[in-house]
A protein has these predicted regions:
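Acidic beta-strand-loop-alpha-helix segment within the catalytic core
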Residues: 1-75, 118, 127-140
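Oxyanion/phosphate-interacting regions
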Residues: 54-60, 74-140
Length: 140
């Protein structure tokens, strides 16, 4: 996943093999929180969070969140810069596949609101709700 305006490139090729390319060198995503351990940070696609999303923010005790566009949301969770990304159904399978691999290969998880695994090859290709958790959040 490449974010040209941020000049950030993330990739993965198997379990424990998620990286960010920094100065032309791969840096393994360490999954260590880069924020205060007392504050749970979430990333969102909107500043106007729907009640269903706010319910999960309350459940997980999210202290603050930041709006961010693109699949970069998955990458910043995998890198430990944010703890969570929670979204309602809106994207198709191809919108999340690369981010899904990067998060899971960094030790994080992606599940739906009912804690089911995210599966691919659905007839309409639409995703369900998503809860993306970084490894540091799962371990914490």
């Amino acid at each position: 996943i490449y974010a040209p305006d941020k000049k950030r490139l993330f990739y993965s090729y198997g379990p424990s093999n998620s990286f960010e390319l920094i100065d032309k060198r791969p840096k393994r995503l360490a999954n260590k929180r880069k924020n205060n351990v007392d504050t749970i940070k979430a990333v969102s696609y909107s500043n106007n969070l729907k009640p269903e999303i706010l319910k999960f923010h309350k459940k997980f005790k999210v202290g603050n969140y930041k709006k961010m566009k693109s699949s970069l949301k998955f990458c910043v969770v995998a890198a430990g810069e944010f703890d969570l990304y929670i979204t309602e159904p809106r994207a198709c399978e191809w919108d999340i596949a690369a981010g899904h691999a990067i998060v899971e290969h960094s030790g994080g998880s992606i599940r739906d609101f009912n804690d089911n695994e995210i599966l691919y090859g659905k007839p309409n290709f639409k995703n369900q709700s998503l809860i993306v958790k970084g490894k540091s959040f799962l371990d914490g």
